[in-house]
């Protein structure tokens, strides 16, 4: 009986128990919207508090926000280049903050143990639809960056240095969003499931070090995603691209 009970509870943590919203003929993953709104709301409160009383000598939350701004600026400048990095800072910063907050929400909050009438909650980035959408957004962005800076000359990249490279470079355009999306999805989902299982088995002590490890890996994954997005954009706008 105990073994069967354990199996039942573990099964409740597996992928696929979504909270669906039906809008006409479209079925949406409601848990992604709910958790995204909660986490983005918390982020907006954090930013509002940090920018409420701006001072020349920053302290507390303002100091942290300015550190994040400087970090994103340096990341964009390094990967994209001095010429156009300012145009892409809002995009890279938004990507980084959304992925970072979503990842940390998954590491800190055992969403899957929150009982709902149907389905289950989860970190937005633990849903493959979210990570694929983010990756496709990155792909559209670097295409736009290349075309807006070079015009039709951008497509010379596909046959440089030889036309033989054409199929391989087209394939690369498909593998970039796939690697971005599955890397982020796999890491965050695995961390969320491990924390959920450990909270169920040993609810007080054991999950804590795993949660700290999850916070670290979640931050690294957000950094990797934003860095690769900036790198792809920088690659598209380079003159020798």
From Swiss-Prot:
The protein's matches in CDD domains, at most eight in alphabetical order, are given as: ATP-synt_Fo_a_6
Q: Where in the cell is it found?
A: Cellular thylakoid membrane
SUPFAM superfamilies (UniProt xref): F1F0 ATP synthase subunit A
Q: Which residues span the membrane? A: 30-50, 91-111, 128-148, 193-213, 214-234
Membrane topology per record: Multi-pass membrane protein
One Gene Ontology MF term: proton-transporting ATP synthase activity, rotational mechanism
Q: Which InterPro entries match?
A: ATP_syn_F0_a_bact/chloroplast, ATP_synth_F0_asu, ATP_synth_F0_asu_AS, F0_ATP_A_sf
Query: Gene3D superfamilies recorded for this chain?
Result: ATP synthase, F0 complex, subunit A (1.20.120.220)
Arranged from A to Z, the UniProt key words for this protein are: ATP synthesis, CF(0), Hydrogen ion transport, Ion transport, Membrane, Thylakoid, Transmembrane, Transmembrane helix, Transport
A Pfam family matched in the record? ATP-synt_A
GO CC, alphabetical: plasma membrane-derived thylakoid membrane; proton-transporting ATP synthase complex
How is the quaternary structure described?
F-type ATPases have 2 components, CF(1) - the catalytic core - and CF(0) - the membrane proton channel. CF(1) has five subunits: alpha(3), beta(3), gamma(1), delta(1), epsilon(1). CF(0) has four main subunits: a, b, b' and c.
Give the similarity note.
Answer: Belongs to the ATPase A chain family.
Role description: Key component of the proton channel; it plays a direct role in the translocation of protons across the membrane.
**The protein's name:** ATP synthase subunit a
């Amino acid at each position: 009986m105990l073994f069967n009970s354990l199996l039942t509870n573990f099964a409740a943590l597996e992928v696929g128990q979504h909270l669906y919203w039906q809008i006409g003929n479209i079925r949406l993953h409601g848990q992604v919207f709910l958790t995204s709104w909660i986490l983005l709301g918390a982020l907006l409160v954090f930013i509002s508090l940090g920018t409420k009383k701006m001072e020349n000598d920053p302290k507390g939350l303002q100091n942290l926000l300015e550190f994040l701004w400087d970090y994103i600026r340096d990341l964009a400048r390094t990967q994209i280049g001095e010429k156009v990095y300012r145009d892409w800072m809002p995009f890279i910063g938004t990507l980084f903050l959304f992925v970072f907050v979503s990842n940390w929400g998954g590491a800190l909050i055992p969403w899957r143990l929150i009982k709902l009438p149907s389905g289950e909650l989860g970190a937005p980035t633990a849903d493959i639809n979210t990570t694929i959408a983010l990756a496709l957004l990155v792909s559209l962005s670097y295409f736009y960056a290349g075309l807006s800076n070079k015009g039709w000359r951008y497509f010379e990249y596909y046959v440089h240095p030889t036309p033989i490279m054409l199929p391989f470079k087209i394939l690369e355009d498909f593998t970039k969003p796939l690697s971005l999306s599955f890397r982020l999805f796999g890491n965050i989902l695995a961390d969320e499931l491990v924390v959920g299982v450990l909270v169920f088995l040993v609810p007080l002590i054991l999950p804590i070090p795993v949660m700290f490890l999850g916070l670290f890996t979640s931050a690294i994954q957000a950094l990797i995603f934003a860095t690769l997005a900036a790198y792809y954009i920088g690659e598209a706008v380079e003159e020798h691209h």
